[in-house]
Amino acid sequence: MTRFPLRRAERAMPRDEALAVLDAAEFAIVSTVDDDGMPYGVPLSFVRRGDTLYFHATNEGGHKTVDFRRDDRVCATAVTGVEAFFEDGDFSTSFRSAITFGRVREVVEATEFKHALVDLCMKYVPEAKRSIGKAMEKEGPHTSVWAIDIEEISGKAHPGPRGDASGDGRTDAADDGGCAGTDAGRQTDPVAGAYPVAALGGEGA
């Protein structure tokens, strides 16, 4: 892959801040290339754990999963803190963005599969954690989980007139390996990390 230097080098972000953008983002655009060379990008809800991004799909498959199985190279892009402004006679936009490159794979190991779905639910609907187990029992057989193992990541930020391009403020998520806002109800698993016991149908469910 050809790499180009960042034109505005002063806007580059360190790795931990780029990861924080991923954690704060509501969705990412995951891009592939069709078998005829046409680029294809699809917005997906996702969650990060460490250097891996997880998202789900149906077992029926579709455009993106056909591309995944043909070529596992993908790019995922996320943006937060977007705000247009006019200052000193110029129009501009504040933002924080992250671009990742990696390899996509289908998650087939049971523990990783379960934890990925729990983390996704806890990112987007943490208030419903006690219902996750039942939902997984119902929808799990019809669901596939995919993972992007990050090989490269870069970030870029343009502060607005207030000097702030931090998105929604969840920038501390990178410190705990992702899954922002999912600490409540966790129990540590020495193999696969932390997860809400109640969501898996264990004690307290």
Regions found by a protein language model. Give the residues of each.
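Hydrophobic/basic alpha-helical segments enriched in Actinobacteria
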Residues: 15, 20-26, 34-35, 52, ...
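Short, structured beta-strand-loop surface elements
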Residues: 60-119
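C-terminal edge-of-domain segments
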Residues: 108-205
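Short helix-to-loop capping/linker segments positioned immediately adjacent to catalytic or ligand/cofactor-binding
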Residues: 29-34, 86-88, 104-109, 130-136
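Structural motif
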Residues: 52, 73, 103, 152-154
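Short, basic/aromatic recognition patches
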Residues: 1-29
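A generic local secondary-structure boundary/capping motif
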Residues: 19, 65, 88-90, 135-138
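Short beta-strand segments
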Residues: 25-60, 76-77, 86-90
